[in-house]
């Protein structure tokens, strides 16, 4: 791998960069920091790659909601946890779907499948505001459609089993739920930044499967920890889609938690990556 180069996509935006790979990328002097994405990029609107990226986000989030909501309903329908896949199975469904969908869509849209991930990458200037807003809209629409198809196939069961809607469990306060969502999303978005870091990818020869695997595993672990508290949101589109289709008061009572928490967690992860891990503000001064 000595002396070779490859195109490395930064985060999940459309700006490739030519970087050395393997042993030739070990030195900081061999790495060039990619330019920040522009805030507004009207030219994207005329590009098919822009529109197909949004379609990929829509389909991925649609499939994500369809599989995961069905899994949650299957567990709730069982007479006891031993008769179903249980919390571990739900966590595997969420983590496994993220692993598969990020792997499938990373080369097209970056494989966000989550408004919090998109927001964090936008704050780190990995993609434009134009693309970020478009992604979030398509993710939410995909989530609504995914939950809607589940309800269309099983209307009675969907309403009786809660429709996979996120709520704060009895015995926990709104503060506890908010904290769980903030920290859970921080873990996820921090993992996304680390797994898609252009410098690390260049140094490690950018093996494609290395990014989806830790991201999916992070989702799995966060679900194990926070399902008993909030049912695990960490994805505003997932929470919104289930809440809209279920459409009961208890699904909306604490719905703000599943937007505010993930966005705060994503913002903290973006700041931590940019300021502490990459020290970009300090590099620009020197």
From Swiss-Prot:
It is found in: Cell membrane. Pfam families: MIP. This is Aquaporin PIP1-2. The chain crosses the membrane at residues 55-75, 82-102, 133-153, 175-195, 209-229, 257-277. The keyword NAD does not apply. Widely expressed. Expressed in roots and above ground. Residues 1-34 are annotated as: Disordered. It comes from Arabidopsis thaliana (Mouse-ear cress).
């Amino acid at each position: 791998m000595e002396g070779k180069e490859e195109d490395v996509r930064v985060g999940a935006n459309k700006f490739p960069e030519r970087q050395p790979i393997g042993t030739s990328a070990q030195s900081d002097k061999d790495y060039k920091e990619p330019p920040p994405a522009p805030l507004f990029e009207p030219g994207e609107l005329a590009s098919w790659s822009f529109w197909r990226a949004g379609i990929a986000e829509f389909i991925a989030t649609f499939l994500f909601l369809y599989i995961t909501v069905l899994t949650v309903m299957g567990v709730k329908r069982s007479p006891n946890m031993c008769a179903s896949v249980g919390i571990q199975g739900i966590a595997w469904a969420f983590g496994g779907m993220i692993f598969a969908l990020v792997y499938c869509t990373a080369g097209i849209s970056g494989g966000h499948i989550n408004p919090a991930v998109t927001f964090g990458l936008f704050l780190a200037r990995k993609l434009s505001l134009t693309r970020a807003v478009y992604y979030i809209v398509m993710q939410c629409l995909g989530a609504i459609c995914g939950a809607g198809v589940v309800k269309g196939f099983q209307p009675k069961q969907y309403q009786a089993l809660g429709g996979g809607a996120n709520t704060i469990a009895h015995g926990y306060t709104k503060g506890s739920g908010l904290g769980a969502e903030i920290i859970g999303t921080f873990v996820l978005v921090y993992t996304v930044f680390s797994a898609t870091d252009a410098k690390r990818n260049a140094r490690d020869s950018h093996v494609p499967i290395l990014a989806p695997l830790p991201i999916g595993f992070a989702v799995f672990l966060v679900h194990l920890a926070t399902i008993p508290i909030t049912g695990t949101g960490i994805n505003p589109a997932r929470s919104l889609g289930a809440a809209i289709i279920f459409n009961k008061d208890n699904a909306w009572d604490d719905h703000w938690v599943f937007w505010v928490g993930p966005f705060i967690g994503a913002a903290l992860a973006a700041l931590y990556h940019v300021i502490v891990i990459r020290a970009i503000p300090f590099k620009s001064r020197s």
